[in-house]
């Protein structure tokens, strides 16, 4: 029997990652500068998680100005007015914390997981880079992190097997002027062309407290946590009112097929469909479908394509 070793990847592209609705007791309030705050007490462990969500991602960018949201994910770790360069991670590490950041089409997130007695440290660090980052950002900072992002793109895309399809796929599903049509990491050309002032202007437009949510969950006393948050964040100046993203409805009128030549041993088939926005009718159904199709070795596609047909080595379905 002829055997074709074929990695197969199926995907359903949604506007943002899906989530389940869970009944969690919270306290929610808003500071005068517009910062949205959500608190949740959970005393099962002596730890706390601090998350800052900026309501900006690659979907807020413009053609010719791609990659700015992801670039700022890096720049925000380079120090701020009251946090010397290199000390942000150092102070958190000394406190026993784990921290990182991530960027998607619709949001940028920074988090710290740390012992609950170090909560104030995380709040101070996050408030300082929210309000006083541009005081210390220099062209050298921008150039340095621009090079880091370019190297990240080379590692994850240019030098990664099968990665070209991840960059090409959004452009096949969305019109060229739609902000979901380009990758979160941006293009090399746009990153190279961005000036120091271009990058700073993007921060001024989107990174104020009135365009952010602060979530603190874990071993906290709600009243005490609220006082700390008000102390560190109330003086952060309100930012501009950012423009609201309004995306036209997208549909595909016909099937599109694209073939890539790559230096890989095995071919890959990647099939994608547009799916409903988060929480819309059909969103949860497709999450369940993806799980049924490919989660685990007893899933339907895994059994059919790998065990029975011996046509693939890997199969993945996701929304």
Where are each of the predicted segments found?
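N-terminal secretory signal peptides that target proteins for export/translocation
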Residues: 1-2
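Bacterial N-terminal signal peptides
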Residues: 5-15
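Charge-rich, well-structured scaffold segments of protease-associated domains
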Residues: 30, 89-241, 259, 269, ...
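M16/MPP (pitrilysin/insulinase) zinc-metallopeptidase core fold and M16-derived inactive scaffolds
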Residues: 49-113, 181-185, 295-311
